Amino acid sequence: MLPMITLFGCSESAKHSVREYPETRKDLTVVDNYFGTEVADPYRWLENDTTAETAQWVEAQRAVTEDYLSQIPFREDIKKRMTELVNYERYSLPSKRFNRYLYSKNDGLQNQNVIYIQNSLDEEPSVLLDPNTLSDDGTVALSGTSQSNDGKYLAYTIQRSGSDWVEIYVMDIATRQLLPDHIEWAKFTGASWYKDGFFYG
């Protein structure tokens, strides 16, 4: 229902204004030859996301999009209602290793779930890993966790700025200290423990 309302609101707003979209440069010099067939790729320059021109293009697109969406008259009402719907405590199922229980919890509006640990079901839980503190700007995401078979270590993977590449860290659960083991440039993988090590891809 909400997507239909949103689209209707956008359409109504669009009727009252003529929007000027930013121009996108076409580079007609970029042509690939595949076995005798020439294929033009005039927008390949946009694949280089580190240039000033690409950054300016993205900013122009963001500005025109925000201007369009800001004219939805009930946009704030939708935001308020959606916030109300997701603002509740959420828990994962706990996992147990050698009388330690690990689970994740979200208080409601946290960007990422926090990993908690308990040494017994009667003990007050404590924070083992809070991914919301991994970066100041929220661009580092926790993508997976894996507890060692002896319950001593937690391997976890993070992604930076939405990248498919992941980094693997290993934490000593008792001390909360990171081990020197730090693996970079892994992809689409977690850590699968075997004895005192783990496999990854």
Language-model segments: residues:
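Beta-propeller folds
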Residues: M4-G201
